[in-house]
Amino acid sequence: MGFHHVAITTRDPEATHRFYTEVMGFELVRVEAAPAAEGGWARHLFYDTGNGECLAVWDIHDNPAVPDRFETSISRGLGLPSWTNHLAFAARDLEELTATRDRWRACGFDVLQIDHGWCTSIYLDDPNGIAVECCCTTRAFGPEDAAAAEELRRAAAPPLLDAMVPEVYPALSLASS
């Protein structure tokens, strides 16, 4: 079973739209606006991420059950580090991952990159403070991986990996010479 869509909420629909269309390269494919059960109304925007899956964004208006300044970052709202709750999108191969990293930098973002040994990931935050990852699997999982994963899942004190230090790729200058 795959994902149909994952939904997030925004307080800045224009910045969010620019981010997911220009930076991420997704296409806005559907918008629904409807009254909310508690009052007010909401707009639900669907961005095609590829393979028939979507990222949905809620834009909430005049809802008495929703505070004016609500926290859009799930992690920050729970008092957790930003990397805990995040969106991870798949790159087909390392060339696509590199092209995505270069596009993010050209859009003015510093990009973190980590080689996890079985995948390589790049990271940035969206305008809502949600961590966004693009990940390329570099090694297939085998039966030994599943067995080791189950053992580590059950371990009271699993062995820890060495700290992963990301490579930082700074944003490219947006100023023209």
List each language-model region with its residue ranges.
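Short, flexible, glycine-rich and Lys/Arg-enriched loop motifs at helix boundaries
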Residues: 37-41, 72-73, 144-147
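Short, surface-exposed beta-strand-loop junctions and turns on beta-sheet-rich folds
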Residues: 63-64, 138
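A broadly used, surface-exposed interaction patch
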Residues: 57, 65-70
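Vicinal oxygen chelate
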Residues: 2-11, 46-50, 68-177, ...
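Short Gly/Pro-enriched turn/cap motifs at secondary-structure boundaries
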Residues: 35-36, 78, 112-113
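Histidine- and/or cysteine-centered catalytic micro-motif in compact active-site loops
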Residues: 60-62, 92
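Core segments of cupin and vicinal oxygen chelate
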Residues: 9-60
